[in-house]
């Protein structure tokens, strides 16, 4: 049986960290708030991770994939309140996604019960995390620049209309994405062509 601690649902045998307890308690406290009370009642989280970014830190809250849309509805109010509670640390909400290994070929291959779904591939999970990381901004374009030494730099173009909302956080987005995936990414707000 999964263990339920406040708003946190942990799978069997997993130890609950102190930051997870704090975020779970903060979500319970926010349920009494009028802004998000009705929507937050049905929602829960499955994990919390704190990422150190030089002199700052960010808190990544993992939620179940089916509940991600519901979290997006209350995202601005929820993030604002949680950032107040945690002393200005940046709060990011991501879906907990699983990456399945590539099926092996040749003599090492084991028979598979079913084909690996596209949503469980490394590329699909990394792309989905990128979209969730910059929410409420929208990714309008992506470019991959391969340098002469073979290193790849990902350029992500965000919607110019959201620059005031998330413009100050793009350094945090890049650092967290590098920690999660190992990919260097830069965010830009290009002017619309048309």
Swiss-Prot record:
A biological-process GO annotation: ribosomal small subunit biogenesis
UniProt KW keywords: Ribonucleoprotein, Ribosomal protein
Organism superkingdom: Eukaryota
Disulphide bridges: none
Pfam families: Ribosomal_S7e
Example GO molecular function: structural constituent of ribosome
GO CC list: cytosolic small ribosomal subunit; small-subunit processome
Keyword Ubl conjugation in annotation: no
Matching InterPro entries: Ribosomal_eS7 (IPR000554), Ribosomal_eS7_CS (IPR047861)
Family recorded in the similarity comment: Belongs to the eukaryotic ribosomal protein eS7 family.
Protein name: Small ribosomal subunit protein eS7
Organism: Caenorhabditis elegans
Gene label: rps-7
């Amino acid at each position: 049986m999964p263990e339920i601690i406040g708003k946190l649902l942990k799978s069997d045998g997993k130890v609950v960290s102190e930051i997870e307890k704090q975020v779970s308690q903060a979500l319970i406290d926010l349920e009494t708030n009028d802004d998000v009370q009705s929507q937050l009642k049905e929602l829960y989280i499955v994990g919390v991770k704190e990422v150190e970014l030089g002199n700052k830190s960010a808190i990544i809250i993992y939620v179940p994939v089916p509940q991600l849309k519901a979290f997006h509805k209350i995202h601005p109010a929820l993030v604002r309140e949680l950032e107040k509670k945690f002393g200005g640390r940046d709060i990011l909400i991501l879906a907990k996604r699983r990456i399945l290994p590539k099926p092996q070929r040749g003599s090492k291959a084991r028979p598979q019960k079913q084909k690996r779904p596209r949503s469980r591939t490394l590329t699909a999970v990394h792309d989905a995390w990128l979209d969730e990381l910059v929410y409420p901004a929208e990714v309008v374009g992506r470019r991959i620049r391969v340098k002469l030494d073979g290193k790849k730099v990902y350029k992500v173009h965000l919607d110019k209309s959201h620059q005031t909302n998330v413009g100050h956080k793009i350094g945090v987005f890049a650092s967290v994405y590098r920690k999660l995936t190992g990919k260097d990414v830069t965010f830009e707000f290009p002017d619309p062509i048309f």
